[in-house]
């Protein structure tokens, strides 16, 4: 395949155009008065959303060089979403401002490596300043405030606050679509563990990249499953019953895994295979926990139960199973409350009896998984489009609330970043040459989120930024007033804001230090040249 290459300033400017196109589409959604973006879908109606990462994921540009820039910023949004679950629009706006400011200086002759180094030092300093300024979050009301800001909806905020308070810090909150118009909170028995699907072919929902099984069987196996003849008899019985199955084993590999994948692709049997978490005795004990939760039996050759001879009776059951690339959640297992309570009591006795802190910690982790339960927020709306949009907002709110419990909160609405920018003056003055230029680029870029929040609310962004930079008060875009944002409940989780700054800085440095860009030559062009030979 022939390639096209651009060098130096031309390559960097093409990347910048791509960054700008994606960021301009995303930044209109920033703030409580941000607008919506409509995304056309290949199937079904359009998606209306104000979620940065959803918009970013949907954008591919025609010009291959510009597309490289767009993909780099997309990675900022995705990475921030993976770490903190929210703040994707802020990260995108910061990345755009950093790229723009950095390239302006590089074009004027600054050394890109030194500017990049200054940007990295400034990002670390901002990260530390935000952590130092954080206010810890505890209590339902404080969590609800964070979720309300993220989702722009008080009802959702209160629900998320209640959900997280009910299941605790280590508990699980999942978001489902409801068949009614109401959005409601249901706390059910459930377990989550940190292992995801063994093959992406098991995914059933391509939007969320999840495998979702409704009313499923659960097969628990003590050892590896690799032989197809061992697994086939049981698979046939499961297929006859017409239900999906979750397989949890030490590992599933070889022809057993490929058969499950082929059946999933052909839709003859809905199955998902995951590895059991932990190692050694802890893995065995956790499989026994799952057996209690799902009312199943662990297939264990040591006890005379082999996979080849196992019948439907060894399988556990669950109302719903959700598997992502990193974790598996089993909701409403068929185990009785008495059995689960007895198992939890046994774990508590073991916790009291153990002398080892490490064992105690691991047993408490198992107890939290077993007894913590799962809070399910069922999202309802009048139309499919409204339902999707609301579901995105609820998912963001849950992520933001969890992030707030982790690292605390700072004043929201871009104010914390403008306040952190004042801390960079000292750092800038302590550095010399182009490193100081890099710090100044970050200092200016930190004003961008507040600038666009104010602009989207119909005000002059520059005026609002200078007013917030002068005083102690922040800008509340929902009420168009200035005040103490922590008291008003306009707050952002530190984890979200920090991730946005660090990820944006990392991509900006990449763009600044790019000297050439290589892309595939479009097919038609290549063909045209081959036909015309040497004709000039």
From Swiss-Prot:
GO CC terms of this entry: cytoplasm
Residue positions binding ATP: 29-32, 86-90, 413, 476-478, 492
Pfam families (alphabetical): Cpn60_TCP1
Catalysed transformations (reactions): ATP + H2O + a folded polypeptide = ADP + phosphate + an unfolded polypeptide
UniProt xrefs under SUPFAM superfamilies: GroEL apical domain-like, GroEL equatorial domain-like, GroEL-intermediate domain like
InterPro entries, per the entry: Chaperonin_Cpn60_CS, Cpn60/GroEL, Cpn60/GroEL/TCP-1, GroEL-like_apical_dom_sf, GROEL-like_equatorial_sf, TCP-1-like_intermed_sf
GO biological process, one term: protein refolding
Domain of life: Bacteria
Key words, A-Z: ATP-binding, Chaperone, Cytoplasm, Isomerase, Nucleotide-binding
Predominant place of localization: cytoplasm
GO MF annotation list: ATP binding; ATP-dependent protein folding chaperone; isomerase activity; unfolded protein binding
Record carries keyword Isomerase: yes
Compartment(s) where it occurs, according to its Swiss-Prot or TrEMBL record: Cytoplasm
Record EC number: 5.6.1.7
Metal-binding found in the keyword field: no
Self-association state and partner proteins as the record states: Forms a cylinder of 14 subunits composed of two heptameric rings stacked back-to-back. Interacts with the co-chaperonin GroES.
Known role: Together with its co-chaperonin GroES, plays an essential role in assisting protein folding. The GroEL-GroES system forms a nano-cage that allows encapsulation of the non-native substrate proteins and provides a physical environment optimized to promote and accelerate protein folding.
Family membership: Belongs to the chaperonin (HSP60) family.
Protein name, UniProt field: Chaperonin GroEL 1
Organism placement in taxonomy: Bacteria, Bacillati, Actinomycetota, Actinomycetes, Mycobacteriales
């Amino acid at each position: 395949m022939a390639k096209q290459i651009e060098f130096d300033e031309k390559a960097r400017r093409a990347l910048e155009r791509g960054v700008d196109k994606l960021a301009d589409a995303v930044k209109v959604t920033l703030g409580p008065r941000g607008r919506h973006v409509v995304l056309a879908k290949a199937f079904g109606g359009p998606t209306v959303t104000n979620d940065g990462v959803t918009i970013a994921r949907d954008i591919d540009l025609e010009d291959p060089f510009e597309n490289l820039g767009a993909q780099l910023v997309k990675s900022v949004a995705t990475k921030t979403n993976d770490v903190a679950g929210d703040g994707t629009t802020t990260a995108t706006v910061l990345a755009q401002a950093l790229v723009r400011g950095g390239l302006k200086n590089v074009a004027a002759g600054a050394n890109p490596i030194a500017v990049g180094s200054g940007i990295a030092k400034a990002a670390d300093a901002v990260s530390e300043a935000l952590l130092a300024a954080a206010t810890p979050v505890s209590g339902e009301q404080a969590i609800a405030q964070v979720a309300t800001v993220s989702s722009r909806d008080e009802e959702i905020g209160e629900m998320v606050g209640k959900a997280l308070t009910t299941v605790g810090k280590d508990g699980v909150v999942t978001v489902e679509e409801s068949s009614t118009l109401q959005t409601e909170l249901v706390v059910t028995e459930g377990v989550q563990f940190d292992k995801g699907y063994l093959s992406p072919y098991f995914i059933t929902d391509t939007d969320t990249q999840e495998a979702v099984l409704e009313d499923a069987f659960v097969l628990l196996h003590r050892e590896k499953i690799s032989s197809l003849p061992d697994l086939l008899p049981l698979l046939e019985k499961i297929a006859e019953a017409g239900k999906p199955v979750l397989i949890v084993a030490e590992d599933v590999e070889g022809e057993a895994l490929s058969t499950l994948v082929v059946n999933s692709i052909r839709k003859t049997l809905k199955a998902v295979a995951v590895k059991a978490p932990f190692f050694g005795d802890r893995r065995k004990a956790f499989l026994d926990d799952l057996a209690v939760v799902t009312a199943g039996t662990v297939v264990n050759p040591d006890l005379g139960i082999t996979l080849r001879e196992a019948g439907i009776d060894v399988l556990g059951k669950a109302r719903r199973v959700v598997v992502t690339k990193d974790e598996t959640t089993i909701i409403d297992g068929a185990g009785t409350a008495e059995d689960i309570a007895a198992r939890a009591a046994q774990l508590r006795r073991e916790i009291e009896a153990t002398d080892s802190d490490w064992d105690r910690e691991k047993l408490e982790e198992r107890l939290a998984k077993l007894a913590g339960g799962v809070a399910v927020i069922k999202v309802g709306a009048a139309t499919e489009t409204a339902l999707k949009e609301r579901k995105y907002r609820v998912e963001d709110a849950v992520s933001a609330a969890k992030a707030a419990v982790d690292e605390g909160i700072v004043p929201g609405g871009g104010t914390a970043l403008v306040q952190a920018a004042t801390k960079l003056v000292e750092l800038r003055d302590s550095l010399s040459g182009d490193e100081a230029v890099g710090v100044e680029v970050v200092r200016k870029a930190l004003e961008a989120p507040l600038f666009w929040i104010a602009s989207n609310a119909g005000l002059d962004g520059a005026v609002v930024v200078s007013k917030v930079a002068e005083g102690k008060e922040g800008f509340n875009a929902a009420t168009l007033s200035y005040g103490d944002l922590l008291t008003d409940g306009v707050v952002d989780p530190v984890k979200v804001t920090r991730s946005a700054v660090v990820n944006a800085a990392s991509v900006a440095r990449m763009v600044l230090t790019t000297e050439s860009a290589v892309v595939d030559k479009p097919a038609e062009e290549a063909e045209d040249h081959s036909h015309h030979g040497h004709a000039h």
